[in-house]
């Protein structure tokens, strides 16, 4: 189901933060978010439940929690400014929402980069129905 929503969003041409987040992931991991992070484990992609499968999946869990803490923001579509130099992502100026969304995405991209060694192909396109453990709280 997560994969369906991700593809649907991409087909309608979202130009906001999801594409910016993909670029951050590419900077930090040298991998495209699609297919490597869009439906990985129990939390990477749309929604999430259960326990994160590994450190990479935990990056997505923490990212979801970061988005949940944003009130009156549109984290999946709002655009923000950022730059990078020598592999360091720097969130730029903008509204408080834009800055917070950028920081959530930056932290997740950095987390993915720091945990590349935990990435397991067996968790790519992981079925939601296998995410049955009790969910953790943010």
Curated annotation (Swiss-Prot):
Active site residues according to the UniProt entry: 63, 105
Tissue: Expressed by the venom gland.
Keyword Acyltransferase: no
Subcellular location: Secreted
Major enzyme class: hydrolase
Catalytic activity: a 1,2-diacyl-sn-glycero-3-phosphocholine + H2O = a 1-acyl-sn-glycero-3-phosphocholine + a fatty acid + H(+)
GO biological process: lipid catabolic process
Gene3D superfamilies: Phospholipase A2 domain (1.20.90.10)
Keywords, alphabetical: Calcium, Disulfide bond, Hydrolase, Lipid degradation, Lipid metabolism, Metal-binding, Myotoxin, Secreted, Signal, Toxin
Cofactors demanded by this protein: Ca(2+)
Disulfide pairings: 42-131, 44-60, 59-111, 65-138, 66-104, 73-97, 91-102
InterPro entries: PLipase_A2 (IPR001211), PLipase_A2_Asp_AS (IPR033112), PLipase_A2_dom (IPR016090), PLipase_A2_dom_sf (IPR036444), PLipase_A2_His_AS (IPR033113)
GO CC terms: extracellular region
Binding site for Ca(2+): 43, 45, 47, 64
UniProt key word Disulfide bond: yes
Family: Belongs to the phospholipase A2 family. Group II subfamily.
Assembly and binders: Monomer.
The protein's name in its UniProt record: Basic phospholipase A2 Cll-N6
